[in-house]
């Protein structure tokens, strides 16, 4: 019997146990890596599913245009939408002019500007739908789609704005003032949000619109 064989025989049970432990450790590491990868994939899939669900919800929410006709964002499927909460007696009311210019510039490429009057901020939209429509036409020659008055915050928040600003939204958080803006791509996904101070001709806003349009 050689010295090496003697050592091997002496180590027998301990060596086998050590080898078994190493094998188990390797298997445990592989199992952990596999479980981690699976969990990451599940989280990613969940995020994608949530995003798709929010987009689908936006498309289906019942709305009324400013004339009282039933509609949904789904009626504008395949378009790029700029959703704006508007008011007639606000310091930002002048943005109607820029929004109309933006609409006329890009409407043939698929942009739809959407005005949603609300009276939530300083009671700056006291008019009814007829008065709002007349004001927008006479003062700014607005031709982009306008909708019935709705709430954008608090207990009276419309389901559209609940979806746009809720915890599962792409850009959660309450609208702070009139002329807040949400940009929705052709698939129905909200891709950008802008506050009241962002003018319709803002370079960043225009560039994002052009990218969404594929210009």
Task: Identify the role of each PLM range.
Residues 1-26:
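N-terminal amphipathic/basic-hydrophobic helices that include classical n-h-c signal peptides
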Residues 162, 167-215:
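Thiol-/selenol-based redox modules, centered on thioredoxin-like
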Residues 21-40:
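N-terminal secretory signal peptides and thylakoid transit peptides that target proteins
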Residues 92-158:
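Structural microenvironment flanking redox-active thiols in thiol-disulfide oxidoreductases
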Residues 51-74, 159:
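N-terminal "domain-start" segment that seeds a small globular fold
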Residues 76-91, 113-116:
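Short active-site neighborhood of thiol/selenol oxidoreductases, capturing the structured segment around
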Residues 35-37, 42-60:
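N-proximal helix/coil linker or "cap" segments that precede and/or mark the start of modular domains
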